[in-house]
């Protein structure tokens, strides 16, 4: 049930990242964000100068599969500034998460830069359960590269191998 001050207004947040690949940690951030916002846009930043572990198309397909039954989550890709993408999708907040103080200092710096460039855009830091705070995309990539099982680090039902040669 919406409170009176939210009638007619959706609270939309953008959760930007490379998501290469999308992990249980990312999934937990989205779950926390959905407690605060009506809609969360998972926005995959596409750096055309980098070749990712997974193609951008594969990352998008993987995340869309995770949220196929959740109309409150949208998945997009972008090559512009995150603040510009936030405006394009109607977001008033950027959702981020931190695992430690180093992450916090970095996110605070980015949040202040965004506040300077986009006065109407807030940054919201969410904390994820301790069970997933150690999970990162780089950990998944490294373990996979050395032949280790990464299934427990990915959202349920996601097999990384299904996306490695996606679209080729």
Region spans (language model):
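Nucleotidyltransferase catalytic core that binds NTPs
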Residues: 2-168
């Amino acid at each position: 049930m919406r409170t009176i001050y939210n009638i007619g207004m959706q609270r939309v947040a953008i959760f930007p990242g490379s998501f290469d690949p999308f992990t249980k940690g990312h999934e937990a951030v989205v779950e926390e964000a959905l407690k605060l916002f009506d809609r969360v846009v998972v926005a995959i930043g596409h750096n055309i100068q980098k070749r990712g572990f997974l193609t951008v198309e594969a990352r998008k397909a993987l995340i869309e599969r995770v949220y196929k039954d959740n109309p409150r989550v949208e998945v997009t890709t972008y090559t512009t500034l995150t603040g510009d993408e936030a405006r394009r999708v109607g977001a008033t907040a950027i959702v981020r998460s931190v695992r430690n103080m180093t992450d916090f200092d970095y996110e605070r710096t980015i949040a202040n830069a965004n506040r300077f460039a986009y006065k109407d855009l807030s940054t919201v830091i969410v904390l994820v359960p301790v069970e997933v705070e150690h999970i990162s995309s780089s950990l998944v990539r490294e373990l996979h590269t050395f032949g280790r099982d990464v299934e427990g680090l990915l959202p349920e039902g996601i097999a990384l191998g299904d996306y490695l040669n996606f679209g080729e």
